[in-house]
A protein has these predicted regions:
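Compositionally biased low-complexity segments at domain edges in trafficked proteins
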Residues: 181-209, 372-391
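Mobile cap/lid helix-loop segments that border enzyme active or cofactor-binding sites
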Residues: 72-73, 187-273
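...captures the hydrophobic TM-helix bundle architecture rather than a specific catalytic motif
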Residues: 19, 23-29, 189
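Histidine- and aromatic-rich segments of cupredoxin/plastocyanin-like copper-binding domains
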Residues: 120-123, 129-132, 232-421
Length: 424
């Protein structure tokens, strides 16, 4: 993509332009920057997404100019915002969602985790042909569930360029999760580079964006702490497998900027509360690549819902979730301000927002934790999807049928005796 494709008017300095956009990513103040006669929307917005509700909703897919890093780029947006509008619907309703594609290429919207007829699922080549340029596709389905979900494009790299939004379905009856107020927190990642170029680089060199490779300094640290034999063996097994102990993600902050409801860490999304209120946070991982470790320093979170399903409440200090997952948590803030801190699993960056009693109050932002090397259990222990899967609890299951697995390759070979499966 040509960095000089879009130039600023001579009367506006680059410094002023970047400063003016520091609190938001999508251009709203400079409609003359947008090319005339194109599908671009010149009235785009960012931060907490606008909210749409009702039984009939209209969405428009278009291109918008964005600036998250000081560089103007083209995004794929729904109704001109990143994230796309939050859709707040009700269980039991039949909804009609009219989606118009103004792009020059096909597009689609997939309703992630929603029970519906396959024709409405929004996956091109599988459930329908896609939404062709200039066409309007009408999604119509009954809402058979409630909870926190999301929607996104299933075409090309459009999700990666901004086409995602929250989908909140209120229960038919009174919600058993009671809160004084709530906020949607949609975490995502953004790249200024052409996603196809990013993908092409990964195909040539899978670790090209991994800037946490083991170093000589790491070796001497292990040598000092664990001795020569341990330091060498720790590296030998990875070398023999031609793998890296820091292969935690395909991409990193070398390619990505991390967004919190469409806002960069500098922009600092903000949600207000009153002390003692119970606040519901609907976390959605809308990233294309990134696993986030989420915590709110000095404030515990009680997980009450996972992927739209109510769960037995569990109080945690931190949780990890990957692309496509959702968690609803309850918090009861007592101080003036808290930072919602979502650091990436490979520890190269973070998204963050603030909960506060007023707009002029901030909380400290913690430093990113040191990267942790993977262990063999991380790489192999969870790859089997049978009864030997390391993360599954089979303690309440009947004993498995005795089978001799010793001649089979794979993790199951280590558990030739069925009784050992009950340990996992």
């Amino acid at each position: 993509m040509d960095d000089n494709k879009f130039k600023l008017p001579a009367s506006i300095s680059r410094r002023r332009f970047v400063q003016g956009l520091a609190v938001g990513g999508v251009i709203a103040s400079f409609p003359h920057v947008v090319r005339a006669g194109s599908s671009f929307k010149d009235n785009a917005a960012t931060g907490s997404a606008p909210e749409l509700s009702g039984k009939v909703i209209e969405l428009t897919i278009a291109e918008s100019l964005v600036n998250f890093t000081g560089v103007v780029r083209t995004a794929t947006t729904i109704n001109g915002s990143i994230p796309a509008p939050t859709l707040r619907l009700r269980e039991g309703d039949e909804v009609t969602i009219k989606v118009t594609n103004t792009l020059s290429v096909p597009s689609s919207i997939h309703w992630h985790g929603i029970i519906l007829p396959y024709q409405m699922d929004g996956v091109p080549g599988l459930s329908f042909k896609g939404i062709m340029p200039g066409e309007t596709f009408v999604y119509k389905f009954n809402l058979q569930q409630s909870g926190t979900y999301w929607y996104h494009s299933h075409s090309g790299f459009q999700e990666m360029t901004g086409m995602y939004g929250a989908l909140i379905i209120e229960p038919r009856e009174q919600d058993i999760i009671v809160a004084d107020r709530e906020y949607v927190v949609q975490l995502s990642d953004w790249t200024d580079d052409d996603p196809m170029k990013v993908f092409s680089k990964l195909k040539v060199q899978g670790d090209i964006y991994n800037y946490n490779q083991p170093t000589v300094r790491d070796f001497f640290r292990d040598l000092s702490e664990k001795g020569l034999s341990s330091a060498l063996s720790k590296r030998k097994m990875w070398q023999e497998m031609r793998m890296s102990p820091t292969d935690l993600g395909d991409l990193s902050s070398a390619a990505l900027t991390y967004l919190f409801n469409g806002s960069t860490p500098l922009a600092n999304w903000r949600g207000l509360f009153k002390k003692g209120e119970k606040v519901r946070l609907r976390f959605i991982n809308g990233a294309s690549n990134t696993f986030f470790d989420v915590r709110i320093p000095e404030l515990q979170m009680t997980v009450v819902q996972s992927d739209g399903q109510n769960v037995h409440p569990v109080t945690v200090d931190e949780f990890r979730f990957g692309p496509g997952e959702t968690y609803d948590v309850l918090v009861t803030p007592q101080s003036d301000a808290y930072t919602i801190f979502a650091q990436t699993i490979e520890r190269t960056g973070y998204a963050r927002g603030t909960l506060a009693v007023a707009n002029n109050i901030n909380a400290p932002v913690p430093a990113v934790d040191p990267v942790e090397w993977l262990a063999m259990a991380d790489m192999m222990g969870n790859m089997s999807h049978d009864a030997t899967m390391g993360v599954m609890d089979h303690s309440q299951h009947a004993p498995a049928m005795p089978m001799d697995l010793s001649q089979h390759a794979g993790p199951a070979a280590a558990f030739a005796k069925a009784s050992t499966c009950l340990l996992y």
